[in-house]
């Protein structure tokens, strides 16, 4: 018996077959790409794809700071979607995350015909440039053996105190005794500017910035005691150790297979995750001078590791961006020569 289908049923079956074939082709391409990728790199990419919860907004911030800023700080939304799609971030999630970043005044929109560019706001660019100075630094800060203090000299409401604590935490300040925010090398002027940018200008009249030197009295507490009182370095050390454990195999494979060219897409995706993971660590790191840190501090190894992996991935990842990075008008802006200055003075990790 011959079975016949209505026109609508035939269209539905044809569409289903096309979707099935498309998915089969996509899986085949992904499997073929996986065969061409170095195993530790593939593992890192797969680990990210298998996460149940992905903070897409935070990842997009990392992409803007690392890849978009050197090309003028703007990108067509469709291009951003294509760049992040291989990490299995769907279009809806990316659009929603970018919209939220615009509401938070990190980004703004600029239409061009039927397309839209997203670009950094002046305040967003200022925050990115400040973060870049920390992320791509070649060494730990030097210390003049003086402490920077911000002392509260007026009454603060509980909500004001918590907002102040959070804002200064992201600037690297620790807390001593509730009313003293301390750091060995922070820029006090920049810290006050950051408070203004966070909408806390009304608190400045209740804060006293100070520079303090060690009076060196006999059995008094020393600088290391100050560090232990102001920061929880044990937790941070564990996070750095996890970073090293995650990316050390990647570096070893890149070193061992220097004759094998990593493909541009994998280089870009790994570079993005590398900087994303490292940036999130630095947000929690007060960036203390080496002299104040414990011996064999894992943050030092993590910095050298990040530097070398990044420099090895840079050429292939930039070639990938040359291909997929577009503005709404169809142009592909060139990367700034300053990109090559990132981690410029990095010594190889022994």
What are these model-predicted stretches?
Residues 111-117:
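Short, Lys/Arg-rich nucleic-acid/phosphate-binding segment
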Residues 71-83:
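Short acidic, hydrophobic short linear motifs in intrinsically disordered regions
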Residues 37-63:
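Short alpha-helical segments that sit at the start of domains
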Residues 105:
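Glycine-centered, phosphate/nucleic-acid-interacting loop/turn motifs that mediate DNA/RNA or nucleotide
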Residues 133-176:
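Amphipathic alpha-helical dimerization/coiled-coil segments
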Residues 95-99, 116, 165:
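Short, hydrophobic-biased segments on the C-terminal half of alpha helices
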Residues 158-256:
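Mid-protein regulatory/catalytic core that forms ligand/cofactor-binding pockets
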Residues 221-350:
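C-terminal regulatory/effector modules of DNA-binding transcriptional regulators
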């Amino acid at each position: 018996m011959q079975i016949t289908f209505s026109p609508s049923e035939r269209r539905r079956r044809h569409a289903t077959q096309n979707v099935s074939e498309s998915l089969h082709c996509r899986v085949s391409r992904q499997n073929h790409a996986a065969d061409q990728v170095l195993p530790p790199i593939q593992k890192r990419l797969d680990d990210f794809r298998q996460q149940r919860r992905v903070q897409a907004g935070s990842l997009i911030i990392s992409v803007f700071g690392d890849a978009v800023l050197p090309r003028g700080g703007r990108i067509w939304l469709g291009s951003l979607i294509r760049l992040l799609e291989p990490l299995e971030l769907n279009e809806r999630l990316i659009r929603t995350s970018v919209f939220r970043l615009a509401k938070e005044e990190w980004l703004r929109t600029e239409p061009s015909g039927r397309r839209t560019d997203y670009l950094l706001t002046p305040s967003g660019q200022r925050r990115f440039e400040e973060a870049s100075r920390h992320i791509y630094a070649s060494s730990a800060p030097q210390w003049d053996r003086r402490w920077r203090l911000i002392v509260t000299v007026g009454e603060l409401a509980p909500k004001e105190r918590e907002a102040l604590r959070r804002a200064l935490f992201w600037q690297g300040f620790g807390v001593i005794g509730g009313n003293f925010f301390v750091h060995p090398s922070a820029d006090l002027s920049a810290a006050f500017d950051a408070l203004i940018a966070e909408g806390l200008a009304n608190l400045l009249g209740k804060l006293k910035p100070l520079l303090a030197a060690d009076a060196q009295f006999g059995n008094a507490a020393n600088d290391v005691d100050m560090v232990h009182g102001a920061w929880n370095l044990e937790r941070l050390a564990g996070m750095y150790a996890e970073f090293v454990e995650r990316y050390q195999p990647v570096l070893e494979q890149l070193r061992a297979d220097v004759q094998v060219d990593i493909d541009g897409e994998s280089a870009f995706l790994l570079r993005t995750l590398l900087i994303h993971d490292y940036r999130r660590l630095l947000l929690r790191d007060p960036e203390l001078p080496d002299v104040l840190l414990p011996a064999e501090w894992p943050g030092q190894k993590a910095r050298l590791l990040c530097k070398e992996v990044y420099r090895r991935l840079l050429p292939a990842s930039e070639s990938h961006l040359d291909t997929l990075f577009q503005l709404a008008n169809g142009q592909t802006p060139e990367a700034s020569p300053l990109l090559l200055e990132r981690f410029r003075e990095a010594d190889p990790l022994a």
